């Protein structure tokens, strides 16, 4: 798995299951084979997406009729993608 996949799995668990981000992040990073740079990116994506969730939802709702009708997994992908585009300036292309 790459850093974005790891981050998305963590975000899904936190937002859908109510898991604690720090515990899930620690476990997933320890279980992964990511290098330090990718671990740092995954950490930033998780904490940043969760921290900016309300702002990201406002941005998404400008383009979607009813955000509550979206599947959770799709919504979290959009949140993470928009977080990267709006708040990170040195993220490598996928």
Q: What annotation goes with each model-predicted range?
A:
Residues 1-94:
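Class I Rossmann-like S-adenosyl-L-methionine
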């Amino acid at each position: 798995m790459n850093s974005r996949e790891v981050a998305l799995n963590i975000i899904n668990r936190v937002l859908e299951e109510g898991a604690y981000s720090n515990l899930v992040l620690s476990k997933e990073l320890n279980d992964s084979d990511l290098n330090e740079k990718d671990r740092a990116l995954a950490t930033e994506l998780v904490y940043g997406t969760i921290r900016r969730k309300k702002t990201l939802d406002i941005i998404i709702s400008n383009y979607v009729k009813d955000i509550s009708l979206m599947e959770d997994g799709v919504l979290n992908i959009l949140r993470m993608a928009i977080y990267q585009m709006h708040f990170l300036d040195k993220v490598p292309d996928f």
